[in-house]
UniProtKB/Swiss-Prot annotation:
Pathway field: Purine metabolism; IMP biosynthesis via de novo pathway; 5-amino-1-(5-phospho-D-ribosyl)imidazole from N(2)-formyl-N(1)-(5-phospho-D-ribosyl)glycinamide: step 1/2
Catalysis: reaction(s): N(2)-formyl-N(1)-(5-phospho-beta-D-ribosyl)glycinamide + L-glutamine + ATP + H2O = 2-formamido-N(1)-(5-O-phospho-beta-D-ribosyl)acetamidine + L-glutamate + ADP + phosphate + H(+); L-glutamine + H2O = L-glutamate + NH4(+)
Record-annotated disulphide pairs: none
Protein name: Phosphoribosylformylglycinamidine synthase subunit PurQ
Source organism phylogeny: Bacteria, Pseudomonadati, Pseudomonadota, Alphaproteobacteria, Rhodobacterales
Quaternary structure, from the entry: Part of the FGAM synthase complex composed of 1 PurL, 1 PurQ and 2 PurS subunits.
Species of provenance: Jannaschia sp. (strain CCS1)
Domain Glutamine amidotransferase type-1: 3-222
Annotated EC: 6.3.5.3, 3.5.1.2
Length: 222
C-alpha cells in the first residue's frame, strides 16, 4: 500500500501524517505542491495540517488552486481515497471535494488540546474499525475549525450518513458539532482533529491509529 502526502509552503504536519500512514503499514511518498501528477501506484492521498500559503485569503484557498490539487481532484473523481486533516480539510472544502466551509472558531481563539470525539458513522473505509457511538480522544489544533453548512447540505449529510465524527464538547462552534465529513462515495474524509497525533501511547493515546488501520484493511480487502 502506498500513500502520497502533499507538502505546501506552510505545511507543518506533513511528517506527522506520514507517521500515521506508516503506523498502518503504508509506504509514504511526499509530494510537493508544484507537481502536476501523483506518483504511480498511489492508494491514498493525505493532505496535512498546517498553514498552507500562510492562510492568506482564506485557509486552504490558495492551496486549492495549486497544480497538485488538480491531480488530487482527478484521483478522487476516479474513486481514489483522500484524507484531509485540519488545513487539509479546509483545502478539500475549498476544492469542493467536500461540502461546507471552515470559519474562525466561535471563541475567536486558537484551540489546542485533546478533544473527545464521537464516531457518528462506521460505514466508510476510514471508520469501519470503530463502532457508532465510540468516544475517542484525538488532538485538535486550529483557529479556523468552525464547520458551517446550509440547511440543505446538513440534511444531505445526515440522510446519507456522511458525518464521520462529531465533537462531544464542541470547541469551536461547528454546526451540529461536526468534526469530520465524508464525500458521497465515502472515499474522501475531511476532519479538523489530528488522528496522526494519536497513534502512539507515548504521545497520549492510540485512538487515531484505528482510522489508519481501517483504511489499510479496506484497501487490502478491495
Amino acid at each position: 500500500m502506498k500513500a502520497a502526502v502533499l507538502v505546501f509552503p506552510g505545511s507543518n504536519c506533513d511528517r506527522d501524517l506520514a507517521v500515521g500512514f506508516r503506523s498502518a503499514g503504508f509506504e509514504v511518498e511526499m509530494v510537493w505542491h508544484k507537481e502536476t501528477a501523483l506518483p504511480a501506484g498511489i492508494d491514498v492521498v493525505g493532505i496535512p495540517g498546517g498553514f498552507s500559503y500562510g492562510d492568506y485569503l482564506r485557509c486552504g484557498a490558495i492551496a486549492a488552486q495549486s497544480p497538485i490539487m488538480r491531480a488530487v481532484a482527478d484521483f478522487a473523481g476516479q474513486g481514489g481515497h483522500v484524507l484531509g486533516v485540519c488545513n487539509g480539510f479546509q483545502v478539500l472544502c475549498e476544492t469542493r471535494l467536500l461540502p461546507g466551509v471552515l470559519m474562525r472558531n466561535g471563541g475567536i481563539k486558537f484551540v489546542c488540546r485533546a478533544e473527545p470525539l464521537v464516531v457518528a458513522s462506521a460505514t466508510s473505509p476510514f471508520t469501519d474499525g470503530y463502532s457508532i457511538g465510540d468516544r475517542i480522544a484525538v488532538p485538535v489544533a486550529h483557529h479556523d475549525g468552525n464547520y458551517q453548512i446550509d440547511d440543505e447540505g446538513l440534511s444531505a449529510l445526515r440522510s446519507e450518513d456522511r458525518i464521520a465524527f462529531t465533537y462531544a464538547d464542541n470547541p469551536n462552534g461547528s454546526r451540529a458539532d461536526i468534526a469530520g465529513v465524508l464525500s458521497a462515495n465515502r472515499r474522501v474524509l475531511g476532519m479538523m482533529p489530528h488522528p496522526e497525533r494519536a497513534v502512539d501511547v507515548a504521545h497520549g493515546g492510540t485512538d487515531g491509529s484505528v482510522l489508519f488501520a481501517s483504511l489499510a484493511a479496506a484497501l487490502v480487502a478491495a
